[in-house]
Amino acid sequence: MTPGRRSSTFTRLLRHGFTDPSAAERLLDGAGLAELRADPVLLEALGATADPDLALHGLVRLLEAQPDATARQELLDTLIAAKPLRDRLLGVLGASEALADHLARHAGDWQTLVTYEPRDLHRGVEEFERGLAEATDPVTLRVAYRRCLLSIAARDVCGTIDVAETAAELADLAIATLRAALALAEAAAPEDAARCRLAVIAMGKCGGHELNYVSDVDVIFVGEAADTGPDADEAKAMRAATSLAAHMMRICSETTVEGSIWPVDANLRPEGRNGPLVRTLSSHVAYYQRWAKTWEFQALLKARPVAGDPGLGAEYVAALQPLVWQAADRENFVPDVQKMRRRVVENIPLTEVDRQLKLGPGGLRDVEFAVQLLQLVHGRADTSLHSGTTLDALEALAAGGYVGRTDAAQLDEAYRFLRSMEHRIQLHRLRRTHLVPEDEADLRRLGRSLGLRTDPVTGLLRAWKRHASVVRRLHEKLFYRPLLDAVAQLAPGEARLSPEAARERLVALGYADPAAALRHLEALASGVTRKAAIQRTLLPVLLGWFADSADPDTGLLNFRKVSDALGTTPWYLRLLRDEGAAAENLARVLSAGRLAPDLLMRAPEAVALLGDGVAGGLRPRDRAQLEQETLAAVRRADDAVQAVTAVRGVRRRELFRTAAADIVGSYGTETQPVEADQGALVDLVGGAVSDLTSATLAGTLRAVVREKWGDVLPTRFAIIGMGRFGGHELGYGSDADVLFVHEPRDGVAEREAGDAANKVVSEMRRLLQVPSADPPLLIDADLRPEGRSGPLVRTLKSYEAYYRRWSLGWESHALLRAEFVAGDEELGRRFIELIDPLRYPEGGLGEDAVREIRRLKARMESERLPRGADPKLHAKLGPGGLSDVEWTVQLLQLRHGHEIAGLRTTRTRTALAAARDAGLISEEHTATLDEAWVLATRVRNAVMLVRGRAGDTFPTDPRELAAVGRYLGHGSGHAGDMLDEYRRTARRARTVVEDLFYA
């Protein structure tokens, strides 16, 4: 061979897409192909394949496998003369290494491809049955199956059948194979076959007539006794049916010298793998009527009798199909289906999520779930939607106005492309996978197999991401956009949801008042303004987020109120349109209960906090920042009323910021997962609200002093936080427990100083409770010496004298939480120095005092628990609740605080950790108490967020209870699970309390 000849061939091979032209040249020199190397038709045909190198290698192997020279020449002659055969054979060899292996083992099977013309009719089950008829055992069945598969793959890769036809033929081939396998099983056990009637119901993609190249074939078995007379032995018949079904599954699933066909999976049957393999029809019906979960009815959408007794199969479908179309009436139907979809995504390994073609975001399952959801909601009233095939169902949904035509067309295109990718990925080695390969050679072959010849890798990845993006954008919006079309003006000829269909869909989404919801949608989406246009774009997504809450009606109503208040404000529309997190954060906040929306409605401009830009951010501000802002507001004001109004406005805004951060952290969003550390959320809320209360008191104090006395009050004045306030554990609705301490300035009479201090307190309390748009802050000084009977304000000397002579045990106990919060810092420091010996007594608390604390605790439990309340569900005073944990920790502080520095803190969780570190409590007991305290605190926070008023027990209203559950991480319909979890957690904590506190 001359160098020029070689160079010319090398160049031609390179031009035709060979990646290793040198190796290709060597192959063309042998195996009788030398005469073809100059044939431009053959090289062009090889170059048209997905992988020319692989196709040539497979062709050489096929030629070498021919039994003799005559057979080899026949193959070569056919390749030259018959273009359809040439394109199909080389197309398969270039796309599927596994089918090339099959052809190398069964060298005559290439002739299967000769009999088909370029324009193919769909091959039905019966034709595939004829193709499998020669199979007499599992091995020959596998060979016949691969031969039939070869014909499907050949026409698929050549484009003479599209992806939907390919999937349908693969399903028909699977059905023919199930029938052949069942026939083999019956032939092996004729007595069993005579004893029973057995029907095979195809499920999943086989039932839906849309199977992959390599997939489990999902089935359900139904059996009955063949003899229906009085002497029929049902138990014996069911054993026979089970034996036949199991044998049929083995024939398909077991690996032989010819490999396996595919696994037959019967786990969609009632009770899954724990249930009997075969049931009678009546047993199936009883299960679905009493026990089936929502997803099981969704699975029945695709149920189709395919093998065995046709009459029994038809009876099965007739009995169960009516139940399928009642599934949408089940409580929490849509949330349950959507939650299951989210769970699938969450279970994808992180290393695979970006390559998941089927299960990942924007994948095939998103389209299938969305379509099935709509079918189940509207299928009871519209039988045109009763299809198990995704693309057929999508077309029917569009025709009926249940889905916008443009959306349906985009989803159809995306689904076809993604399914084509899935088919070609699996076809290469006939392995079950839904992962897009990472190897560049694999990506190149995959791209070329889909017709992307110019830069196939880049083109493939770009097209895949584009279609996945379309699916991700549309799959949930698909459910909501037609609701807007139902209340909007549409172009002539465009189908729309009927009012009844719109009502059905809203009810399925969890809306209690669908008529009101439609009115809100009409008000929000109607018109030609920029506001209406942006809201029409946003609402389909917002409706989905509202539906994910426990109260979609309130979420939509609140959005309308905010929109009415801010809709003409340019920054508001820009925020929702452009700030990635703002719209979802707003939806979560508006539908999570009453508190946050109420705070927002009083000043809708706080929506700006929900953005993810520089001006946004939900992280609460620290005490120094808050105090600086409140004091600046006071300086700008003309009088105390105006000043405190401004301070309360800051408090309202920051309460909203904290509540929004808490809600977003508890619910999670598309961009921010649920906060895994629930203790961190509790600390965030407690710290933020406590810091905000300190800053509010500091600003109010400054305003009152400035109004009455100018810059200097006649007496030094300090506010000491007590209880949860001092412990940095305030909730949204907590009062501010405080002590007031003052000290006359030099030259000021004690009476004058006392009058001034009392006037300050009185005016602060009045101004912070004046009815206004802002929530009041109640100041509670009942923990002062002598309680309500004692003076409201004392001097430092008076406190010292009282504590030295009259202090009771409960007062030392209460002082554990005392911390300076506002006013004269130096005076506050001296007060803390005064009380330290009381709360951390030298030598620890005596036994008499310990017994007194225990008696007081027991009395409080019996006297303060509200009448009629369930103690086991009372988050504050119930067993294992806040009081139990806090008193246990505080007893450890009183006994050991003098010697363990870590216990000298006002914060419960910090003190608990210090007790653990000091060996006073085990790691296990610490975790138990901490978990109970965090959960009880979150319950109280949730109740306040949901109801807009404080409470220590779970709500009795079902919707409010569901909203509390949603905040605590329990989906719709799982309020019972939430209550059980609380009882278990509290019960474990109570056991520890009895061991540590009462022992």
Swiss-Prot record:
EC number of this enzyme: 2.7.7.89, 2.7.7.42
Keywords per UniProt: ATP-binding, Magnesium, Multifunctional enzyme, Nucleotide-binding, Nucleotidyltransferase, Transferase
Region Adenylyl removase, annotated ranges: 1-483
Cofactor: Mg(2+)
Function, as annotated: Adenylation and deadenylation of glutamate--ammonia ligase. Involved in the regulation of glutamine synthetase GlnA, a key enzyme in the process to assimilate ammonia. When cellular nitrogen levels are high, the C-terminal adenylyl transferase (AT) inactivates GlnA by covalent transfer of an adenylyl group from ATP to specific tyrosine residue of GlnA, thus reducing its activity. Conversely, when nitrogen levels are low, the N-terminal adenylyl removase (AR) activates GlnA by removing the adenylyl group by phosphorolysis, increasing its activity.
Enzyme class: transferase
Organism: Streptomyces coelicolor (strain ATCC BAA-471 / A3(2) / M145)
Positions of region (Adenylyl transferase): 489-999
InterPro entries according to UniProt: GlnE, GlnE_rpt_dom, NT_sf, PII_UdlTrfase/GS_AdlTrfase
Protein name (record): Bifunctional glutamine synthetase adenylyltransferase/adenylyl-removing enzyme
Signal peptide segment: none
GO molecular function, one term: [glutamine synthetase]-adenylyl-L-tyrosine phosphorylase activity
Taxonomy, superkingdom: Bacteria
Keyword Heme: no
GO cellular component, one term: cytosol
Catalytic activity of the protein: [glutamine synthetase]-O(4)-(5'-adenylyl)-L-tyrosine + phosphate = [glutamine synthetase]-L-tyrosine + ADP; [glutamine synthetase]-L-tyrosine + ATP = [glutamine synthetase]-O(4)-(5'-adenylyl)-L-tyrosine + diphosphate
GO BP annotation list: regulation of glutamine family amino acid metabolic process
Membership in a protein family: Belongs to the GlnE family.
